[in-house]
Amino acid sequence: MVWNISLSRQSRFFLGGLCWPITLLAQSAFQEEARSYNHEQSLLRQGQAYLRAHRYEVGLEKLNQLLLEFPEHAQGHYLRGNAYYYLKQREPACTDWRKACDLGQCYGWTFATFERVCEDPS
């Protein structure tokens, strides 16, 4: 990789015989990051909307897709825990709430602890 400052003071880099202005590379990286963020937020919003509409199975599908692509998404784990809770699936709900809390969002785990949702009923 070779750097060159031209007379117009625009930095360019040479790679494999091609010359690209650095601004185009930065713009491309920014656009890719923006697309990823928009996709992430779209899946999250869709999951939230389905949960609010009491369509827990469909919301769960969207949140599963979100967490498959972005496994460290704290709010995704929290919301998926809520979906499992409303579907009366206590163990997966507790697992997701714990994971969300490990990632910094402890609303679900606080609820589960206060309401004793995640304790064995024995």
Model-flagged regions — what are they?
Residues 79, 113-114:
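Canonical tetratricopeptide repeat
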Residues 40, 74-75, 108:
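Helix-start (N-cap) detector for alpha-helical repeat units in TPR-like alpha-solenoids
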Residues 65-68, 102:
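Conserved structural position within tetratricopeptide repeats
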